[in-house]
Curated annotation (Swiss-Prot):
InterPro entries (UniProt xref): aa-tRNA-synth_II/BPL/LPL, Ala-tRNA-lgiase_IIc, Ala-tRNA-ligase_IIc_anticod-bd, Ala-tRNA-synth_IIc_core, Ala-tRNA-synth_IIc_N, Ala-tRNA_ligase, Ala_tRNA_ligase_euk/bac, DHHA1_dom
Family membership: Belongs to the class-II aminoacyl-tRNA synthetase family.
Record-given protein name: Alanine--tRNA ligase
UniProt key word ATP-binding: yes
Database matches in PROSITE patterns: AA_TRNA_LIGASE_II_ALA
Chief location category: cytoplasm
Keywords: Aminoacyl-tRNA synthetase, ATP-binding, Cytoplasm, Ligase, Metal-binding, Nucleotide-binding, Protein biosynthesis, RNA-binding, tRNA-binding, Zinc
Pfam families with a match to the protein in the record: DHHA1, tRNA-synt_2c, tRNA_SAD
Function according to Swiss-Prot or TrEMBL: Catalyzes the attachment of alanine to tRNA(Ala) in a two-step reaction: alanine is first activated by ATP to form Ala-AMP and then transferred to the acceptor end of tRNA(Ala). Also edits incorrectly charged Ser-tRNA(Ala) and Gly-tRNA(Ala) via its editing domain.
Length: 876
């Protein structure tokens, strides 16, 4: 058997099946495309469903692939076992109605045993088959030549996911030798049992039946082959490593982690395994467009990163570091998966940002969790309240799984039902806070069955003659509506744009012979028609009437300027910040535009200026805006940007702005960028993890914004007594220097007053067991002033315990100080201040020599300060 690298095994598998007439299917993105049933691509066959279910006929019915995959159903086992992974590769060969069982078995055996390929010793291989699959048994025994004792019949060898294709499967096992198990009394020591000796290296699925709805099975007219070989497991056998983690797929990551840790892989293998596995998953997922967040696949990434940080702390890594491993992952995989190496700067930036965000709250959260665990143990409780677990999640970003792991290490459990209840209450609060759209509230009841078409003519026309086909008032269809009624209606054709793609709906009016109505909103009905919401302002309106429908042209003109500007902004963001930028949301109205986009880190003022300059340059170049209908495949091949998650038909509307921007879009646009006039960014901010927002105005809105800003600047100049607007910065700088000088003088005076007040406290010193004790209320503006007084008193007394308190509004501030000789006798400022503050309903802590705290009940201050003397007496 050859000792091969992981890259060689992967390529060898593909080359073998290419020789057998298979076409190579490229590895798909981990983020599923048009498959809402999957959170991640989780197997080699997951991306080939379109072929197996007949939606697409492949050019070649023989397919081979190496597919990156993610499974996260048992994250807690990763690191604790030899072969659990969240990210892994599946090698597979597939037949869509072409070859079947005999050929699949023959080629599998050839690849594994022929010295031209893997070259395993034949005597090391065993197989399992389904008890009723005589065909597979006979072929393995008679054609391949496997002895009967190495063909094991197992009831579980049947691939079935419910209704749909199914069939028996045959698994191939490699015997790693007696050093991995030789107990003749072990009931699991056989191929297919739970043991480390016989490892499954390949699964051949023979899809030959259809599982019918009534539970019966009927033969498929076209039989299929679906095989899967886990690369990590196969490589561990070839490289003869105890677990998958010692292979060349993981060891470079583990070695890079060892260089940062205070211990070694040999001494703490679980932590290193967790980190190595999780960084592979996160790096590839981010490279494929997923970003950490609080829901869906983003939550999975956040959970993995935070779990890795937790294990990193156990090996002495107490800072953001996972991002430093991204180049290592990229280097291992670059030959076949170049995307991590190509995007490593962006991936590292995303991971670092997420790590830093978690580290900001981690220590505080751990301290809270430690207190919760301590209290539970002190009261002999075995369960942590769900309310406490939710507080850790909601306030400190602790995923519930992470809390459960910490708690489990302490021999406790979490009330998961209580946690879930708190989560549901939060969701209900969020739902209640969201405003429901009244115009759509009756759609499902009234309009769900309406199939009458409504043709949109608003791309070409701003008004049209139409027929009112359906009228609704309240939740009922009506034949007539009168002045004052709020109604919803369909027209057989309409110039009103229905809100979609971020563009707001048109407003306007309809006029009939007997009345008129003002249209306030338009949305898409369940069956795709444009549903108008309006108020009858004159006379009456009836179903079947002819109506003149007119939009507010001035508003539409402003909307189209902002919409085309949004396309220019999208491309400019990619040009300046990088190709990773993708649209995450938008609003296009007549007053402004808002654009949300994926990007980690701040957008610098210089970058923002570049973006604005690029958009304006394209506006002033007077680029033509061309709109065409194309086939989806052609548009994408031409480089048209499609919105992630948006569903497109086979034909799409393509908006091209000169040679600069190309997007799929159903919205309304200018005919030439010169119509936009001027583009001005009004704000830029972060609105969530990895998502930022730009707001901007165009044309008249940009002029008005700049006029307002100029007016504000003129007003500031007058107040600052600056002769010219250009003098304002210099005048501000001069005033700031005067302010800094005054602050320094104020601080000096405050310090002198503090020292004087501290000196007066020497009269309140009490000697207890040779220790100078001062516990007093003083006048101090803040905690810093208190600390200064305590420092002054510590310098005046060799062996002292000091607690000073000050009222700040309705609250209390405490600072405690203990001199070194007093610390040597067992006094501790942090422990003392915690008890003092607790007596006023507060809390705090700190070092042995200096600590601070806050209190909530000023009425109990005297009682709290009196405790200081009791504390000193208890130790003296």
């Amino acid at each position: 058997m050859q000792r091969l690298s992981s890259a060689s095994v992967r390529q060898m598998f593909i080359d073998f099946f290419k020789e057998k007439g298979h076409s190579v299917e490229p590895s798909a993105s981990l983020v599923p495309f048009e498959d809402p049933s999957l959170l991640w691509i989780n197997s080699g066959v997951a991306t080939l469903k379109k072929y197996f279910d007949g939606r697409v006929i492949p050019e070649n019915p023989r397919i081979v692939n190496a597919q990156k995959s993610i499974r996260t159903n048992d994250i807690e086992n990763v690191g604790k076992t030899a072969r659990h992974h969240t990210f892994f590769e599946m090698l597979g060969n597939f037949s869509i109605g072409d070859y079947f069982k005999e050929q699949a078995i023959e080629w599998a055996w050839e690849f594994l045993t022929d010295k031209k390929w893997i070259g395993f010793p034949q005597e090391r291989l065993s197989v399992t088959v389904h008890p009723e699959d005589e065909e597979a048994y006979r072929y393995w025994h008679q054609h391949i030549g496997l002895p009967e004792e190495r063909i094991i019949r197992l009831e579980g060898n049947f691939w079935d996911i419910g209704e749909g294709p199914s069939g028996p499967n045959s698994e191939i096992f490699y015997d790693r030798g007696p050093e991995y198990g030789d107990d003749p009394n072990d009931p699991e020591l056989y191929p297919g049992g739970e043991n480390e000796r016989y490892l499954e290296i390949w699964n051949l699925v023979f899809s030959q039946f259809n599982h019918n709805a009534d539970g019966t099975y009927t033969p498929l007219p076209k039989k299929n082959i679906d095989t899967g070989m886990g690369l990590e497991r196969m490589v561990s056998v070839i490289q003869d490593t105890p677990t998958n983690f010692e292979t060349d797929l993981f060891m470079p990551i583990i070695e890079a982690t060892e260089a940062l840790a205070s211990t070694t892989y040999k001494e703490a293998d679980t932590a290193f395994k967790v980190i190595a596995d999780h960084i592979r998953t996160v790096a590839f997922a981010v490279g494929d467009g997923a970003l950490p967040s609080n829901e869906g696949r983003g939550y999975v990434l956040r959970r993995l990163l935070r779990r890795a940080v937790r294990f990193a702390k156990s090996i002495g890594i107490d800072r953001p570091f996972m991002y430093e491993l991204v180049p290592v992952v990229g280097a291992i995989m670059k030959d076949f998966y170049p995307e991590v190496a190509d995007k490593q700067d962006f991936i590292a930036r995303v991971i670092r940002t997420e790590e830093e965000r978690f580290h900001e709250t981690l220590n505080e959260g751990l301290a809270i969790l430690s207190d919760i665990i301590e209290k539970a143990k002190a009261t002999n409780k075995e369960t942590i309240a769900g309310e406490d677990a939710f507080r850790l999640y909601d306030t400190y970003g602790f995923p519930i799984d992470l809390t459960e792991e910490y708690v489990h290490d302490e021999g406790l459990t979490v009330d998961r039902a209580g946690f879930d209840q708190e989560m549901e209450q939060q969701r209900q609060r969020a739902r209640a806070a969201r405003q429901e759209s009244a115009s759509m509230s009756v759609q499902e009841d009234v309009f769900g069955e309406v199939k009458t078409p409504s043709v949109f003519v608003g791309y070409e026309h701003t008004e049209t003659d139409a027929v009112i086909t359906t009228l609704v008032r309240g939740k009922e269809k009506v034949e007539q509506a009168v002045q004052g009624d709020v109604i919803q209606f369909f027209l057989d054709e309409t110039p009103f744009y229905a809100e979609s793609g971020g563009q707001v709906a048109d407003r306007g009016m309809i006029v009939t012979d007997t009345g008129q109505a003002v249209v306030k909103d338009v949305k898409k009905a369940p069956n795709g028609q444009h549903l108008h919401t309006a108020e009858v302002t004159i006379g009456e309106i009836s179903t079947g009437q002819q109506a003149s429908a007119r939009i507010e042209v001035r508003e539409r003109l402003d909307i189209v300027k902002n919409h085309t500007a949004t396309h220019l902004l999208h491309q400019a963001l990619k040009d300046v910040l990088g190709e990773h930028v993708n649209q995450a949301g938008s609003l296009v109205s007549s007053e402004r535009l808002r654009f949300d986009f994926s990007h980690f880190g701040q957008v610098t003022p210089n970058e923002l200026q570049q973006i604005e300059e690029i958009v304006n340059e394209k506006v002033w170049q007077a680029l033509p805006v061309d709109i065409s209908i194309q086939r989806l495949e052609e548009a994408k091949a031409a480089g048209a940007m499609a919105l992630f998650g948006e569903k497109y038909g086979s034909e799409v509307r393509v908006v091209r702005v000169g040679d600069y921007s190309l997007e799929l879009c159903g919205g309304c646009h200018v005919r030439n960028t010169a119509e936009i006039g001027l583009f001005k960014i009004t704000s830029e901010s972060g609105i969530g993890a990895g998502v930022r927002r730009i707001e901007a105005v165009t044309s008249k809105g940009a002029y008005q914004f700049l006029s307002e800003q100029t007016a504000i600047l003129k007003d500031a100049a007058e107040r600052l007594k600056a002769k010219r607007l250009s003098d304002v910065p210099q005048r501000i700088e001069s005033l700031q220097e005067e302010l800094r000088k005054a602050q320094r003088e104020n601080e000096s005076l405050t310090a002198k007053l503090g020292q004087a007040e501290a000196g007066n406290l020497n009269d309140q010193v009490k000697e207890i067991g040779g220790v100078a004790v001062i516990a007093a209320q003083v006048d101090a503006k803040d905690t810093e002033a208190l600390r200064s007084m305590v420092d002054t008193l510590k310098q005046a007394h060799e062996k002292a315990v000091i607690v000073l308190a000050a009222k700040t509004g309705n609250k209390l501030a405490f600072v405690a100080g203990v001199t070194k000789p007093a610390i040597a006798e067992g006094f501790h400022a942090g422990k003392l201040i915690k008890e003092v503050a607790a007596r006023t309903g507060g809390g705090g802590g700190g070092r042995p020599d200096m600590a601070q705290a806050g209190g909530k009940d000023p009425a109990k201050l005297d009682e709290a300060l009196a405790y200081v003397h009791e504390y000193v007496k208890s130790i003296s």
